[in-house]
Amino acid sequence: MYFELKENKPHGTKDDPFSTYHIENAGRSFQIPVHWHDEFEIIYVRSGFLTVSISGESYIGKTGEAFVVSPGNLHLMGAQTGTVDYYTFLFPLKYISFRTDDMLDEKLLEPLNSGHLMICPRVKDTAKELCEQLIEIYEAKKDESESKITTQVRTKIILLQFILEMWKKGFVIE
């Protein structure tokens, strides 16, 4: 692993380790430098085209498509030209664990966290609806129209639905 490329920016807080980042780029090229972190990340292209590289594989994401970055995977995002509007959702996998050492933890979440399992990086538009729901929660959190407990419960439910969809569609691989 390239320790010098580890992102040192803290994501979330102790009380709420889930982070949402919204990047809207109007017409000029940009690139988020190659990096890795311990959190699980979902990258969702709300509109436009986004170049995404995950573990050396490059993709062009278009409107409604999502990508998954497993903990520890090198990745970068950018756009050469044009306008892109995208979100990244980051969280430690233990955030959605029930911490009971049950089958979900033992057979899925812990292997995803340790790299023994991963979710295919490109999940196309499979997660569009769930990502849009996460954006709704992000907006409610910003304008404080819901309690912090409500937004956290809603977020965890959607993230568990995301993991379930990836499992059911065969996107979880060794």
Which residues fall in each region the model found?
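Generic protein-terminus/edge-of-domain signal
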Residues: 1-62, 106, 117
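A hydrophobic/aromatic-rich effector-binding and dimerization subdomain
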Residues: 2-19, 74-140
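Short loop segments at secondary-structure junctions
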Residues: 47-49, 72, 94
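Conserved metal-binding segment of the jelly-roll/cupin
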Residues: 61-74
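An amphipathic alpha-helical interaction segment
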Residues: 123-174
